[in-house]
């Protein structure tokens, strides 16, 4: 369940560029997102297969390898940022944006 949750969060991040989630989930999803972008920078078949195995969405993997890999080619890591938003109405969970840097 945890792997599926993180994979879905990263898929949404790749598709939309920014997702709104709890701080805890953002902190957990961030390392996976960074690893997936690093795989996309490699760009070989083995990297693509590893990405498909983790994300389970061919559309997200295509976007990752076609757009994000080339975009971050010269950047040595640090592809995402967490922006805190305050507490959610209802259960007071600390919310944040997990977004891709330019």
Spans of model-derived segments:
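Structured, basic alpha/beta domains of bacterial-type, RNA-associated proteins
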Residues: 1-102
């Amino acid at each position: 369940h945890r792997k599926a949750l993180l994979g879905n969060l990263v898929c949404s991040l790749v598709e939309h560029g920014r997702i709104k989630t709890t701080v805890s989930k953002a902190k957990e999803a961030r390392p996976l997102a960074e690893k997936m972008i690093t795989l996309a920078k490699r760009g070989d078949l083995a990297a693509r297969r590893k990405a498909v195995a983790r994300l389970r969405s061919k559309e997200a993997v295509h976007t990752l390898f076609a757009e994000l890999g080339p975009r971050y080619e010269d950047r040595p890591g640090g592809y995402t940022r967490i922006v805190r938003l305050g507490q959610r109405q209802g259960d007071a969970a600390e919310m944040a944006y997990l977004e891709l840097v330019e």
